[in-house]
Amino acid sequence: LSKTSINGRGKAKKITPEVLEGTHSYQISTKAKFAFHSFSNYYTYPMQAIVSLPDHQFVNPDQNMIKKFDPSLKKDNPLEFFEITTEDNVTMEGWIVKPKNMDPNKKYPVLFYFYSEPAGQTGQNRFGAGYNRLYNGNLSEDGYVYVTFDGRGTPSPKGREWRKAIYRNIGKINVRDMAMGAKAVFKKYDFIDTSRVAVHGWSG
């Protein structure tokens, strides 16, 4: 969350604590004096708190996210974030979970997880990233690579042109981004077995 002058002068100033790297949402009160703040990242269970605005102070000390936040948990999570640029010069962000105890001489099968439409993102830094609740086990421990990235048309903070790119083009531009993105992932991570590729997605 950021604040700026109502006259448009000066630069916007971020008021969300820098240490809380991840995904945030705010429900702001009518007079904008308070907000219900939600936060999580890939290694932090969701937290909620009431904060005052514009100073972003935690109204209830027991809900102080900064004190509860434990960055040391990061080291125990195998998820990594990445950025790729496709042959179409489209840059996309996502995450990858590599197999546990990887053998550098082996290649591993990959499961892509996609949505790539306006209702949401899959590549966010939020709790649950890197896990597939439909899989009865642990993909990483079972020797699979698990990957997602957000293509054009998703509500990524990349501006109107990005979000509106698939207007009247659903199933065309976003599907191409998935295909070209997969090629870029194969090029970036040479331990992926390109003969063993699976794709899972939702309504997109």
Spans of features found by a protein language model:
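Blade-edge beta-strand/turn elements of extracellular beta-propeller
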Residues: 9-17
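Extended hydrophobic/Leu-rich segments
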Residues: 1-4, 177
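Short, compositionally biased segments
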Residues: 4-5, 76
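Short loop/turn segments that connect beta-strands within beta-propeller blades
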Residues: 5-9, 53-54
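Feature targets compositionally biased, intrinsically disordered low-complexity regions
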Residues: 7-9, 21, 119
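Serine-hydrolase catalytic core recognition
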Residues: 16-17, 24-204
